[in-house]
Curated annotation (Swiss-Prot):
It comes from Apis mellifera (Honeybee). Glycans are attached at residues 145, 374, 478, 528, 542. One of its GO terms (cellular component) is extracellular region. Disulfide bonds join 88-108, 264-275. This is Venom carboxylesterase-6. SUPFAM superfamilies: alpha/beta-Hydrolases (SSF53474).
């Protein structure tokens, strides 16, 4: 009898232990298999479920390097999703990088998903799908700090996608049409669309959002039939598909240069790619530095292309023609810029007298790469265009500290602002869905420019990325100043209100959607958390000047 009672007691204790352990490990069942995650706490100490390192595609290695992603196969055992995957193979492009600039792995196509504890919750939550920036060359979805977003009732998703030549090499033919990185994003989006219901997310309320190359990627998903129907709205932060750095020129020429650097024959595309597929990934990544003429400029040697070959292109026409032809996905869109976008990449040299002097002495040679017109202005006009731009923005005298503000404005206008207005105007004119625009000029205690410059704390204004990084970057978002905390919450409210309701709300400010027929450009100016207002500008980004430069870009057929 005693042994029987003991057996019951042990059985009961075992059941309790099993139940407790089971409760400590959140689980979901998806179409590709069961997943076990773990619990984390948000910034305000709210418990949420974390599932990190979920594969959404098969590993693109060996003969699958440079090829479109392949859907992930089902797994039979429970997948332990408690650790982030490796970042994608990349060449780091920041002054803070010391020693080896190459890091990552080709086996990197993974998703991280975060969701408030479900507790048998029935209403499905809106989903925010983050696409990281990094000039299509570096960074990772792993860097996204979700803890602030997990104070809200949304599901947060961050992805990795192939970068640099691994994600954006193009031979301009059937062998490697290109856009593998964008196709990775689309496959990840499809996996989320098909499986997010298991995590408590609503597949019909997915908001894609991204910054810089991530913002341009968001815009590209509006333009691709591959992604149509997989999301409900989007936010492009500091990047659109019209930006010069978001459209790769002379891609086959760059592919051959990479082949030559890897000592592969370049007279036969198929044999060149076979050779490149046999070369060590780290050596290929290291070669990205050979495509940058001055410092890290141009900063996007490998990026999106128009695919003229292949049976399943991501895009087969230029972004401007896709929109103008009415082939753009018609759902709401928000796009905005910050006041000093050009601090990327100007922060690398504006605090350095030696580099400014070098820029002064070699302006005519450097300008086509710094301002990304090397391929869109004929070679015999490079010097003339470089001088014209310099005379307008920098006037007379040497390039030195006195010209820093003008340099930043010049780079902001050319690389971000001009094409931002052009893109939102055209999309608002073609689509029925609303387009909202904003301009952000709040400088927090810390800035991305500190990272880009290698530690300089000089206040040159609001840098590219300062807005989103105040909410998503572990270093910058860990703020204590009351003003920064207030702005942080305002931005979180902005992003999540759009995801939840489909209309952006910023502290009760009046924010009408863009009227594309208005000759003046109107946008919401976020000055600080108490000063938010609509502004009008009839010469935004000095567009009257830039119209005089004959760039072979964003031309209608």
């Amino acid at each position: 009898m005693y042994m029987l009672k003991l057996s019951y007691i042990l059985l009961f204790l075992g059941f309790v232990k099993f139940s407790w352990q089971d409760k400590q490990v959140p689980k979901v069942s998806t179409f590709t298999g069961n997943i076990r995650g773990y619990y984390k706490k948000s910034r305000s100490d709210r418990l949420y479920e974390a599932y990190e390192g979920i594969p959404y595609a098969q590993s693109p290695v060996g003969k699958f390097r440079f090829q479109p992603p392949r859907p992930i196969k089902k797994w039979s055992k429970d997948l332990s999703a408690t650790k982030k995957s490796s970042v994608c193979m990349q060449y780091l492009m920041t002054f803070t990088t010391h020693g080896n600039r190459v890091k990552g792995s080709e086996d990197c196509l993974y998703i991280n998903i975060y969701v408030p504890v479900r507790n048998n919750r029935k209403p499905l939550l809106p989903v925010m799908f983050w696409i990281h920036g990094g000039a299509f060359q570096f960074a990772s979805g792993n860097e996204a700090n979700e803890t602030l977003f997990m104070d809200r009732n949304i599901v947060f998703v961050a992805i990795n996608y192939r970068l640099g030549p691994f994600g954006f090499l193009s031979t301009g033919d059937i062998v490697v049409p290109g856009n593998m990185g964008l196709k990775d994003q689309s496959m990840a989006l499809r996996w989320v669309f098909n499986n997010i219901k298991s995590f408590g997310g609503n597949p019909n309320k997915i908001t894609i959002f991204g910054m810089s190359a991530g913002g341009a990627s968001v815009h590209y998903h509006y333009l691709s039939p591959m992604s149509a129907g997989l999301f409900k709205r989007g936010i492009s932060i500091s990047g659109v598909a019209f930006c010069p750095w978001a459209q790769t020129k002379h891609a086959p020429e760059k592919a051959k240069k990479l082949g030559a650097l890897m000592k592969c024959r370049t007279d036969n595309t198929k044999k060149m790619i076979d050779c490149l597929q046999s070369r060590p990934a780290r050596i290929i990544a290291q070669a990205v530095g050979d495509f940058m003429f001055w410092l890290y400029n141009p900063f996007t040697p490998f990026g999106p292309v128009v695919e003229t070959y292949g049976s399943n292109p991501f895009i087969s026409n230029s972004p401007i023609n896709i929109i103008n032809n009415g082939q753009v996905y018609d759902v709401p869109w928000i796009s905005g810029v910050v006041s000093k976008e050009g601090l990327y990449t100007a922060a690398e040299f504006v605090d350095n007298a030696k580099l400014l002097w070098h820029l002064n002495d070699h302006w005519d040679e450097i300008a086509p790469y710094l301002l990304d017109f090397n391929y869109t202005i004929p070679l015999d006009q490079h010097r003339q265009v470089a001088k014209k731009i310099k005379n307008y923005y920098l006037r007379s005298g040497p390039i030195n500290y006195d010209k820093v503000e003008s340099i930043i404005q010049m780079m902001s206008d050319r690389l971000f602002n001009i094409d931002f207005e052009k893109a939102v105007r055209l999309q608002a004119r073609i689509n029925k869905s609303p387009v909202w625009t904003y301009y952000y000029s709040y400088r927090a205690e810390h800035s991305v420019s500190e990272i880009l410059s290698g530690g300089s704390t000089t206040d040159y204004g609001v840098c590219h990325g300062d807005d989103i990084f105040l909410t998503l970057n572990s270093i910058i978002s860990n703020v204590t100043k009351p003003q920064d905390l207030a702005m942080q919450q305002l931005l979180i409210n902005f992003y999540t209100s759009f995801a939840i309701q489909g209309i952006p709300y910023i502290d009760e400010a009046s924010w009408p959607s863009l009227n594309p027929n208005d000759p003046d450009f109107r946008y919401l100016h976020i000055v600080n958390f108490t000063n938010i207002k609509m502004e009008v500008n009839n010469n935004f980004a000095n567009k009257s000047f830039w119209k005089t430069i004959p760039f072979n870009e964003n031309k209608l057929n």
